[in-house]
């Protein structure tokens, strides 16, 4: 299993842990990530924790610097369920846009990430 596959599996597993598995971009441009598998993913990206209360927080600009503009996470009112890859949105388990599931989109994004 590649590093990208391992990270993707860890990210997918985090949705069963009861914590956020995605981040919320706040008004300060931070991506807030509550304790979950995303902690390890953020650390693997070498991003600083801004110590936002109750969450891990990363500057959106740092996320984009590490991953490019193609990837960041958001949380919707119905739950934590979307990932943005390029200009396509992927809802859990559904094939939309260019036909990728969000898991496939994440793996593709990881493979394109600098340093990988």
Which role does the model predict for each range below?
Residues 1-34:
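Extreme N-terminal leader/activation tails
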Residues 9, 19, 47, 65, ...:
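Short amphipathic alpha-helical "recognition" segments used for binding
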Residues 14, 26-100:
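N-terminal segment of the canonical double-stranded RNA-binding domain
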Residues 95-116:
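Ampiphathic alpha-helical segments that act as solvent-exposed interaction surfaces
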């Amino acid at each position: 299993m590649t590093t990208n596959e391992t990270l993707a599996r860890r990210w997918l597993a985090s949705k069963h842990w009861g914590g956020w598995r995605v981040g919320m971009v706040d008004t300060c441009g931070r991506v807030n990530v509550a304790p979950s598998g995303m902690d390890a993913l953020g650390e693997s990206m070498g991003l600083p924790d801004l110590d936002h209360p109750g969450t891990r927080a990363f500057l959106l600009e740092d996320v984009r610097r590490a991953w490019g503009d193609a990837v960041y996470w958001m949380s919707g009112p119905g739950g934590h369920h979307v990932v943005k890859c390029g200009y396509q949105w992927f809802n859990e388990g559904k094939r939309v846009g260019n036909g990728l599931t969000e898991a496939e989109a994440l793996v593709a994004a990881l493979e394109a990430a600098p340093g990988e």
